């Protein structure tokens, strides 16, 4: 099954410039920024606190100063995720962004230094805008991915190796979901 209505809509979206976007959202555009797009995985034994501590340590080790988090769905684990962000011993400034809409979401992903998470947009929409991302967890397992998507386990070593590969990769590849019923 190929095709994605979201991807088809994303093709037509004009991205906002970084200054306007960050100013509108009252964010500091000069900080090294990671955009975390994470949805809890249903039917999974995902330890939110353990894995977020690893991600936070990875970001700290790579001098990220700001973590922007897209609002999560209501699947099991989302309350723990939000609680960790609000109550955890964060070594990094974070902001939860809600209701971005597709234009701001794609613009944010384009203008930050790193996009990491497990959302289906990593498979469909982000590659259309030539946005590279680190895909964590098995939430998108079985879906065809492009060279824009870098799979990683949530360990310091694997995240670092994946990030290093992402930074040096410049190739643009074909888009697997641009077949059959799509443009």
Describe the predicted segments one by one.
Residues 1-183:
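Nucleotide-activated sugar donor-binding and catalytic core shared by glycosyltransferases
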């Amino acid at each position: 099954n190929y095709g994605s209505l979201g991807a088809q809509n994303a093709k037509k979206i004009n991205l906002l410039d970084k200054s306007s976007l960050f100013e509108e959202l009252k964010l500091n555009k000069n900080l090294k920024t990671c955009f975390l797009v994470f949805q809890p995985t249903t039917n999974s034994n995902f330890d939110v606190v353990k894995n977020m501590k690893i991600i936070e340590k990875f970001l700290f080790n790579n001098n990220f100063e700001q973590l922007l988090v897209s609002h999560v769905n209501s699947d099991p684990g989302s309350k723990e995720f939000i609680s960790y962000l609000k109550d955890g011993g964060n070594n990094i400034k974070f902001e939860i962004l809600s209701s971005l809409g597709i234009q701001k979401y794609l613009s944010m992903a384009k203008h930050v230094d790193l996009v990491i998470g497990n959302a289906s947009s990593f498979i469909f929409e982000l590659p259309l805008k030539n946005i590279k991302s680190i895909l964590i967890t098995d939430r998108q397992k079985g879906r065809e991915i492009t060279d824009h998507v870098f799979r990683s386990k949530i360990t310091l070593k694997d995240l670092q190796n994946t990030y290093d590969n992402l930074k040096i990769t410049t190739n643009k590849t074909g888009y697997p979901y641009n077949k059959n019923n799509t443009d």
